[in-house]
UniProtKB/Swiss-Prot annotation:
Reaction it catalyzes: 4-CDP-2-C-methyl-D-erythritol + ATP = 4-CDP-2-C-methyl-D-erythritol 2-phosphate + ADP + H(+)
EC number annotated for this UniProt entry: 2.7.1.148
Sorted UniProt keywords: ATP-binding, Isoprene biosynthesis, Kinase, Nucleotide-binding, Transferase
Name of the featured protein: 4-diphosphocytidyl-2-C-methyl-D-erythritol kinase
Function field: Catalyzes the phosphorylation of the position 2 hydroxy group of 4-diphosphocytidyl-2C-methyl-D-erythritol.
Pathway where it operates: Isoprenoid biosynthesis; isopentenyl diphosphate biosynthesis via DXP pathway; isopentenyl diphosphate from 1-deoxy-D-xylulose 5-phosphate: step 3/6
Name of the gene this protein is made from: ispE
Keyword Transferase among record annotations: yes
Family: Belongs to the GHMP kinase family. IspE subfamily.
Enzyme superclass (EC): transferase
Quaternary structure annotation from Swiss-Prot or TrEMBL: Homodimer.
Length: 285
């Protein structure tokens, strides 16, 4: 049977870097919220013993694609626990709407959707907590997509506390550049010593992203986009970019600004949601 699963985008409503670890990773405080917009995965399980990606990405070998890596990891863990036969296989395809290097979590969301969906379809019986631990091996943002609730995150982003920020409307714009996360985190000018604060203080303060200054300095396209959006609404970078979002109370207000966007800029309008569309789909299975 062929099933279809959402792989939603996320926004970092704020992102603060509170330190750098000896292993090079950074300690963060960030607020994740999902969007009702993203990629779509189509999954067909079978008894072929093979995992096939029917929609390869240009320049990304299948074995490096997070979709295949997630499927292999789940299969290995399930077979280690004797909850899956050796001939378990699947055909997987993704319809991409989220840009690579956009700060929307597209690859991590794809991986999380594979873990959650195949755990259900293969009936491997892992808990969301176990799946999130597997996901952390694939990327720091994978656990929040697996757990499926808007969250305040600490550590490298893996320690999650459920929160319920307002479900606002967002205009998300892409400046036409792709930004690799290591480029930003290795920048010598990046702020790495923002004081750690309690969640109550963070939620009552103005939201910021510590990566934004570095990205705006390095990428003229991002600087111009943020400056333009700030004329209309509170706006900032998500993740390490490149996407920038502006927040609105209504869809119509977001659409009015979108219609004024300079020619050639790509973007979309979506609502923030505190329960992932992936988990809404899972609950309907």
């Amino acid at each position: 049977m062929i099933t279809t699963w959402p792989a939603p985008a996320k926004l970092n409503l704020f992102l603060y870097i509170t330190g750098r670890r000896p292993d090079g990773y950074h300690d963060l405080q960030t607020l994740f919220q999902f969007l009702d917009y993203g990629d779509t995965l189509t999954i067909e399980t079978n008894q072929s013993g093979t995992l096939r990606l029917l929609s390869p990405l240009d320049g990304v070998p299948d074995d490096d694609n997070l979709i295949i890596r997630a499927a292999k990891l789940l299969r290995e863990q399930a077979q280690k626990h004797s909850t899956l036969p050796a001939n378990a296989g699947a055909n997987l395809a993704v319809t991409k709407r989220l840009p690579m290097g956009g700060g929307l979590g597209g690859g991590s969301s794809n991986a999380a959707t594979v873990l959650v969906a195949l755990n259900h379809l293969w009936q491997t019986g892992f808990s969301l907590h176990q799946l999130a631990a597997f996901g952390l091996q694939l990327g720091a943002d994978v656990p929040v997509f697996v757990q499926g609730f808007a969250a305040f995150a600490e550590g490298v982003g893996e320690r999650l506390m459920p929160v319920s920020p307002p479900e606002k409307w967002y205009l998300v714009m892409h400046p036409g550049v792709s930004i690799a996360t290591p480029l930003v985190f290795n920048d010598p000018l990046l702020t790495r010593n923002t004081p750690r604060r309690e969640i109550s203080a963070l939620l009552s303060a103005e939201f910021r992203n510590d990566c934004e200054a570095v990205v705006r300095n390095r990428f003229r396209e991002v600087e111009q986009l943020v400056s333009w959006l700030l004329e209309y609404a509170p706006s900032r970078l998500t993740g390490t970019g490149a996407c920038v979002f502006a927040e609105f109370d209504t869809e119509s207000a977001a659409r009015q600004v979108f219609e004024l966007a300079p020619a050639g800029l790509q973007g979309f309008i979506a609502q923030g949601v505190n329960i992932s569309p992936l988990h809404r789909t899972l609950s309907e299975q």
